[in-house]
């Protein structure tokens, strides 16, 4: 019984880890950057877009999404 419980616990931990790893791409909450009056800072926090472009930070990435009409998504955090 202890062995099956340990196996179940390890399986659950592995599932949670892999779910986090594979869900990195895709969605970013850009709500705070929808206003065209909001200007982006020069803070460096790269985002790799599905278009192969590296954006300097979340704000620049979100502005590109708006400009593209939602055609760009997050490929992964960091440089492309």
Curated annotation (Swiss-Prot):
Residues 1-23 form the signal peptide. GO terms for molecular function: serine-type endopeptidase inhibitor activity. It is found in: Secreted. InterPro entries: Kazal-type_SerProtInhib (IPR050159), Kazal_dom (IPR002350), Kazal_dom_sf (IPR036058). One of its GO terms (cellular component) is extracellular region. Disulfide bonds join 30-62, 40-59, 48-80. Pfam families: Kazal_1 (PF00050). This is Serine protease inhibitor Kazal-type 6. The lineage of its organism: Eukaryota, Metazoa, Chordata, Craniata, Vertebrata.
